[in-house]
């Protein structure tokens, strides 16, 4: 948290920077108000980066466009119907929106757009008080009609008006509360939590895409556990990702098993800790985080208490992969993300067979082949999945995975594991067996791939010999 003086210095530096100062002067000259609003003002006090800038104005969209166009490096009006014009001004990307005074009908997913006449009125209709502050330009006057600055210093999340009215207007704000709790490390006011519990059914009118986008922002925060727990505790998760609260299985004192819900949140935390060190991208990894959160969602459907009292979850990896695919599809995730997450969930138990008894080289090759481009993520997920408090067991599992990674590296040097292919390609198979393209060529290819996985590189001559023997048996 920055001091007021430090935050004001940051805001003044931004307000007096060349593109923003020039923009403000143009709006004033045209007889309109302009203010920096929302996230950038909040983030100046929190010491967070000031990237994309949100501005509010008394000007209508056509006027905004006319004022901005001559000085913008680029501009766009995709949000024009909602009063928003976007522009790039030097190093800054800005969105300039006409003051809003929207209303919401009871069953509608979309607001009835109405433009307002005052900055204060615009701020009071925003989601939370800490987001309802503005800096008037060019005067650099702070406007805080609801007490957002007090909330920032108290690390408290509260709505400008009644939480019930706010969430009734836009139910997505309930998910935003969970996201901000995690993203900004703030405590959600008890009146807001109670309203989330009362109003949770209203989230059903929010489009799947908006829910998805908010869940993604939550998961990509530095510490999403707090926000996810809030969604579960208020009952909102039952409506947006019911597989998560379903993990709160009753723990029988005689049939011991992990608290699957708490375990899943811990796996997510541990995956986040590992991703920075293990994965090449500097950005948070959405696929890994989704897989970590959802890796055990097949357990409720597969829980069995055996005759001796032991609890089992046989095939929860396969069941969980199917459930993840279904949920992520319902939330309108892209096909690539859905495929990657469900595949990681399907593979997440594979290593634990290795920890019991080391595999042959063939088993190691198959592990690499099955993971393919997801191998590094699978390494992270598998390591994160060890949450035992038994230090001896934890050390044994960690050592076993270290050994597996060493074997993968050694075989990779010898055999180019990550680009594993049979010794003959499709063209060679067709030429050798005098075949035309068709299903039998695929069968032959898979036969040679199995040989390659079992034994490593055969060489073309040996591959040709075995292929002829296989083909003779297949067609004879």
Predicted features by range, described:
Residues 1-476:
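Catalytic cores of the polymerase beta-like nucleotidyltransferase superfamily
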């Amino acid at each position: 948290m920055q001091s007021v003086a430090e935050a004001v210095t940051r805001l003044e530096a931004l307000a007096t920077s060349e593109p923003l100062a020039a923009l403000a002067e143009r709006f004033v000259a045209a007889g309109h108000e302009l203010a920096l609003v929302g996230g950038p003002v909040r983030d100046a006090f929190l010491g967070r980066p000031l990237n994309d800038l949100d501005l509010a104005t008394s000007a209508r969209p056509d006027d905004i466009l006319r004022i901005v166009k001559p000085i913008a490096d680029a501009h766009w009006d995709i949000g024009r119907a909602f009063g928003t014009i976007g522009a790039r001004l030097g190093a800054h990307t800005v969105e300039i929106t006409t003051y809003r005074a929207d209303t919401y009908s009871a069953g509608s997913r979309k607001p009835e757009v109405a433009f307002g006449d005052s900055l204060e009125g615009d701020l009071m209709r925003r989601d939370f008080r800490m987001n309802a502050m503005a800096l008037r330009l060019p005067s650099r006057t702070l406007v805080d009609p609801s007490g957002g600055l007090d909330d920032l210093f108290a690390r408290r999340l509260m709505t400008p008006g009644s939480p019930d009215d706010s969430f009734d207007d836009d139910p997505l704000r309930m998910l935003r509360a969970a996201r901000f709790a995690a993203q900004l490390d703030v405590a959600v006011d008890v009146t807001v939590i109670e309203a989330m519990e009362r109003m949770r059914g209203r989230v059903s009118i929010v489009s799947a895409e908006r829910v998805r986008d908010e869940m993604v922002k939550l998961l990509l925060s530095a510490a999403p556990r707090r926000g996810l727990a809030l969604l579960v505790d208020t009952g909102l998760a039952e409506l947006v990702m019911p597989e998560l609260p379903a993990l709160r299985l009753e723990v029988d004192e005689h049939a011991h098993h992990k608290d699957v819900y708490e375990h899943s949140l811990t796996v997510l935390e541990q995956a986040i800790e590992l991703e920075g060190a293990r994965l090449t991208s500097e950005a948070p990894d959405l696929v890994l985080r989704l897989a970590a959160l959802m890796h055990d969602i097949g357990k409720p459907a597969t829980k069995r208490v055996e005759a001796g009292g032991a609890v089992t979850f046989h095939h929860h990896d396969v069941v969980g992969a199917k459930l993840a695919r279904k949920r992520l599809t319902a939330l309108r995730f892209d096909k690539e993300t859905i495929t990657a997450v469900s595949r990681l969930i399907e593979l997440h138990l594979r290593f634990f067979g290795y920890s019991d008894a080391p595999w042959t080289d063939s088993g190691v090759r198959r592990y690499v082949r099955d993971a393919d481009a997801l191998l590094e993520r699978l390494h992270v997920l598998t390591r994160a999945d060890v949450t035992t408090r038994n230090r001896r067991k934890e050390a044994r599992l960690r050592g076993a995975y270290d050994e597996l990674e060493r074997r993968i590296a050694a075989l990779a040097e010898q055999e180019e594991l990550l680009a594993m292919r049979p010794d003959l390609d499709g063209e060679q198979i067709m030429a050798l067996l005098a075949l035309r393209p068709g299903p039998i060529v695929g069968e032959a290819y898979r036969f040679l791939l199995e040989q390659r996985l079992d034994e490593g590189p055969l060489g073309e001559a040996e591959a040709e010999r075995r292929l002829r023997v296989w083909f003779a048996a297949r067609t004879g």
